[in-house]
Amino acid sequence: MEKIKLIECPRDAMQGWKTFIPTEIKIEYINKLLEVGFDTIDFGSFVSPKAIPQLADTKEVLNGLNLAHTNSKLLAIVANVRGAEEAVQYNEISYLGFPFSISETFQRLNTNSSIEDSLKTIDAIQHLCVRHNKQLVTYMSMGFGNPYGDAYNSDIAIHWVEKLSQLGNTIFSMSDTVGVSNPDTITYIFSNLVKAFPSLEFGAHFHSTQETAMEKITAAYDNK
């Protein structure tokens, strides 16, 4: 029987808000999401508060979540080994997510490191996850293109999945960071990824509009 996992991502929705969302409101909202039945909730981030002030209260939010009566798992984003070392100490967290950008420019803007350095970081985080019984989810940022003029085509995205899988990564979320994907590029990437790497798990993380959301979801679903 085929299984599709739904991952809800309040962390991504919240992190760009300029006005700080009170911790108790975050807790209340995420607790409601935990009642829905999502496979996983991407709820917070173990990164520097200077980088993402909105998520500086991730530990407080975690302490306020009601996990006793839910099957939903928790995912937290990390951007370096220090953050991963902190996140793996929490038994409540099942997944660590790392944003790996296919765009060199965005990788430096987002994590203050090059793609080459990020490969070393991912390798270290993967070893941490194995030791602490966590799973690493690699968010393939700018997975469908970028606005910086950095080289991109679908085969470049597939190349980086292959490279990262050699480090032991098994879960990849192909992320349309700036909303440039379309059904054709989605179909090409997922049909080729699933064929080339049948043992890996692939997810689709789209930024879209109401008008184009369903056609993107359908393209990914039809090529699962």
Which positions does each model-derived feature cover?
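Glycine-rich, proline-tolerant flexible connector loops at the mouths of alpha/beta enzymes
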Residues: 39-64, 98-113, 142-148, 173-184
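Conserved anion-binding
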Residues: 103-170, 175-177
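Glycine-enriched alpha-helix->loop->beta-strand junction motifs that scaffold or abut catalytic
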Residues: 37, 89-96, 166-170, 192-201, ...
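Glycine-rich, positively charged N-terminal anion/phosphate-binding segment
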Residues: 23-24, 28-32, 36-69, 78-86, ...
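Catalytic alpha/beta core domains of metabolic enzymes, predominantly
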Residues: 177-223
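N-terminal small/glycine-rich loop or linker at the start of catalytic domains
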Residues: 1-18, 98-110, 131-148, 193, ...
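Hydrophobic faces of well-ordered beta-strands that scaffold small-molecule active sites
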Residues: 4-12, 39-43, 72-78, 94-98, ...
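Alpha-helix-loop-beta-strand connector modules within alpha/beta enzyme cores
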Residues: 51-76, 116-138, 186-204
